[in-house]
Amino acid sequence: MKNMKQCEKLEKRKRELENWIRKAYDATGNSIIEGYRAHFKRWKKTYPIEFQIKTIRKGGAFPKVSVLVDSMFMAELKNRILTSGHDLDEIRGDLIFDVSRGGERYVKLNGEEQGAKAGDVLLRDGEGLLATVLFGPARRTSITPETRNVLYLAWCPYGIGEELIRGHLEDIRSNLELAYETLEVGIGIYV
């Protein structure tokens, strides 16, 4: 599938989701948010989705990046589940989730080099880091206008049930279906 800049049906769903976040969304006492807060707090960092939700509640809007990115971001804010998207064709070798020993380095989406923090969760392939929970995905496997095959990963704290994770990934699929007539989708949950 060809990554598109935007899709009118997806833009309409964005406006609906923005309205829901502004009018009906309540993050008070949310166990998903609390799980992420606990992880980020260890490093005196804040859970980025919480900030993004507050921005929309104050009148902000979803950005227009591309259909492959926007579909993921919408599901992230709806479900509060941190997700990374990767160009599957740029991944080299096996994927390995691990806990950082500290100092592993990679280049983030913004082009800055970043060292992983000891104890953070990371993902790597045969060439190096693809993402960390604290600092996000690497530029090397980022979704670009040329991306044809995408891998979405939900980064979940302990305690989020499989049903919620599967529902989150199905929301991404549903968003993509607004733009693409045919999709080849596989959903797997690995703990």
Residue ranges and their predicted role:
Residues 1-191:
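Non-transmembrane, aqueous-exposed alpha-helical and coiled segments at domain scale
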